[in-house]
């Protein structure tokens, strides 16, 4: 393991889940929620060795007694102390590696504040003493994972959605659009519309239950109005869900009303365009000669694109917006939940990429600002 490209680590820090593993693998070894939980109550059992904070799955399993916080909001790290805990947990508990022995590839959302990636760089080199690191744009990695160099990626996770047009491997920064509407907003919206049915979900722990309902039962309707009529006329769309305490709740039109907000953000009281229009607007900001290629290579990525029916609906909506002669193809790879990580794994194991790493030495000479020069 003396070679420099010895086992790079790939860490995709999402707003909702952290995906981590080794470059060259075909799937992340560790996938856990990006959550730090702190006890809500005073410990009374002396000698139990209670911790002052829990990370990831352990925080999730003890959520009843904890206040859960997500250190990444809308793709931007807002709480660095908690973020450090998550990285520490990733390296030492999940992957069981010493970060000072491996180059580390991190990911971030496009159009993030510059200070965000500088601070990431600083923590990697100064706190974890890693030998080399790199920060890659999430959507670009998703395109790599789909085996393309040209296309437009709609990457929608828990905290942020964005559309990134890429031509021959270059992201076109002027045409990147960002939409602060993603999985977490849909979870909150589902909490709200379930309240209308008389079910009350309020705490941070209950929000996780609603997220599970959303992931298991929601889908995107091809025709929203018609689906609403079907739901009103019969009970064919109703599904039941058993809560952890054994009580069973029934959900009907909420199943498709919740993800409909992706196409109609006005449901959430937002004035922005839906994801279909965002993709279209992003394509229209590109050079007229490459639009055809983008329409034909529209790649979905991220957990919020996992709803059944979303690809067909995108096809229908974008076809309605685009010129009638254009061929539109929506690519929704089955592994799209992890495609950012998979792309990172591919990138970090390319021989041509090895000269791209920012080394500890370069960092010591130039400081955190080096990240803007070396990473796209």
Curated annotation (Swiss-Prot):
InterPro entries the record matches: Actin (IPR004000), Actin/actin-like_CS (IPR020902), Actin_CS (IPR004001), ATPase_NBD (IPR043129)
Positions of post-translational N-acetylaspartate modification: 3
A family per Pfam: Actin
Gene3D superfamilies (alphabetical): 3.30.420.40, Actin, Chain A, domain 4 (3.90.640.10)
CDD domains: ASKHA_NBD_actin
Statement: the UniProt record of this protein carries the keyword Acyltransferase: no
Catalytic activity: ATP + H2O = ADP + phosphate + H(+)
Record's comment on post-translational modification: Oxidation of Met-45 to form methionine sulfoxide promotes actin filament depolymerization. Methionine sulfoxide is produced stereospecifically, but it is not known whether the (S)-S-oxide or the (R)-S-oxide is produced.
Keyword Isomerase part of the UniProt annotation: no
GO cellular component entries: cytoplasm; cytoskeleton
PROSITE patterns, per database record: ACTINS_1 (PS00406), ACTINS_2 (PS00432), ACTINS_ACT_LIKE (PS01132)
Compartments reported by the entry: Cytoplasm, Cytoskeleton
Transmembrane segments: none
The entry's keywords: Acetylation, ATP-binding, Cytoplasm, Cytoskeleton, Hydrolase, Nucleotide-binding, Oxidation
GO MF entries: ATP binding; hydrolase activity
SUPFAM superfamilies: Actin-like ATPase domain
Entry's EC annotation: 3.6.4.-
Family, per entry: Belongs to the actin family.
Miscellaneous comment in the UniProt entry for this protein: There are at least 5 different actin genes in this organism.
Described purpose of this protein according to its UniProt entry: Actins are highly conserved proteins that are involved in various types of cell motility and are ubiquitously expressed in all eukaryotic cells. Multiple isoforms are involved in various cellular functions such as cytoskeleton structure, cell mobility, chromosome movement and muscle contraction.
Protein name from the UniProt record: Actin, muscle-type A2
Natural source organism: Bombyx mori
């Amino acid at each position: 393991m003396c070679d420099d490209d010895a086992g790079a680590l790939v860490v995709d820090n999402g707003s909702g889940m952290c995906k981590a593993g080794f470059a060259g693998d075909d799937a992340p070894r560790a996938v856990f929620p990006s959550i730090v939980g702190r006890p809500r109550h005073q410990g009374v059992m002396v000698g139990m060795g209670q911790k002052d904070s829990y990370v990831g799955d352990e925080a999730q399993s003890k959520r009843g007694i904890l206040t859960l916080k997500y250190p990444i909001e809308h793709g931007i790290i807002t709480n660095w102390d908690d973020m450090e805990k998550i990285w520490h947990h990733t390296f030492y508990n999940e992957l069981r590696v010493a970060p000072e022995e491996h180059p580390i590839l991190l990911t971030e959302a496009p159009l993030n504040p510059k200070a965000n990636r500088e601070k990431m760089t600083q923590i990697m080199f100064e706190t974890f003493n890693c030998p080399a690191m790199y920060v890659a744009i999430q959507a670009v990695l998703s395109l790599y994972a789909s085996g393309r160099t040209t296309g437009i990626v709609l990457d929608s996770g828990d905290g942020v959605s964005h559309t990134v047009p890429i031509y021959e491997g270059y992201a076109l920064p002027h045409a990147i659009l960002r939409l602060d509407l993603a999985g977490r907003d849909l979870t909150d919206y589902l909490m709200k519309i379930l309240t209308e049915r008389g079910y009350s979900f309020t705490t941070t722990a209950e929000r996780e239950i609603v997220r599970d309902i959303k992931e298991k039962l929601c889908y995107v309707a091809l025709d929203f109005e018609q689906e609403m009529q079907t739901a009103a006329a019969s009970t064919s769309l109703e599904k039941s869900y058993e809560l952890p305490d054994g009580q069973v709740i029934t959900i009907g039109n909420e199943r498709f009303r919740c993800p409909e907000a992706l196409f109609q953000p006005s449901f959430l009281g937002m004035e922005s365009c839906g994801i279909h229009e965002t993709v279209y607007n992003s394509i229209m900001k590109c050079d007229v000669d490459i639009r055809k290629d983008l329409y034909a290579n529209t790649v979905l990525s991220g957990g919020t694109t996992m709803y059944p029916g979303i690809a067909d609906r995108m096809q229908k909506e974008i076809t309605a917006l685009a010129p009638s002669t254009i061929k539109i193809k929506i690519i929704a790879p089955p592994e799209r939940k992890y495609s950012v990580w998979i792309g990172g794994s591919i990138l970090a194991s390319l021989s041509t990429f090895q000269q791209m790493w920012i080394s500890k030495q370069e960092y010591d000479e130039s400081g955190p600002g080096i990240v803007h020069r070396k990473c796209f």
